[in-house]
């Protein structure tokens, strides 16, 4: 049997985190990952599936996806209020591909690819998401990130993934802005993904 879950071993000192759920290690990871792929802003999430869900939420559209793809993609598209259309396309395997085009921006699925400055190949208003599932180039304890040069879009993802609350380092300073979701990346996820990101160039 092929061992797909081949991760580096780490000992995580939970006492070193300033917050177990959304500590400064998450922000540190977001910054380093954005610097690596050439994007200005990023929001780390508990999974790439949640990035698909939030990016397509209530768009009321039909999204074309390859027939050879994990079911979580179709699930997220459907659960976000859209329809799925399947196409016989295998060119996406091992690379990134356009998940959907809107009038003024596109969504790029790059769960299979992480390379330096790759976001610069696209428009500043585009959204690109990555997966940190254990089998991915930057494997981790699951997790994902969505990046863009469009700060307003990323700020919305940050609020939506943190229960719909305005972002603040201090819990009591946050205010509920709209009904959101608990989809943020936690500190342990960020720690493992960050260590493996720093090893990516050695692969």
What are these regions (language model features)?
Residues 1-59, 80, 153, 176, ...:
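Conserved PLP-binding active-site segment in aminotransferase class I/II-type PLP enzymes
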Residues 15, 114-116, 127-203:
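Active-site region of PLP-dependent enzymes
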Residues 37, 123, 139:
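Structured loop/turn residues at beta-strand edges in well-structured enzyme cores
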Residues 44, 65, 146:
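Conserved SAM-binding loop
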Residues 54-118:
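PLP-dependent aminotransferase-like
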Residues 58-59, 78-80, 120-123, 143-145, ...:
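Short, glycine/charged-enriched secondary-structure capping and boundary segments
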Residues 102-105, 123, 127-129:
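Internal catalytic-core helix/loop-beta-alpha segment
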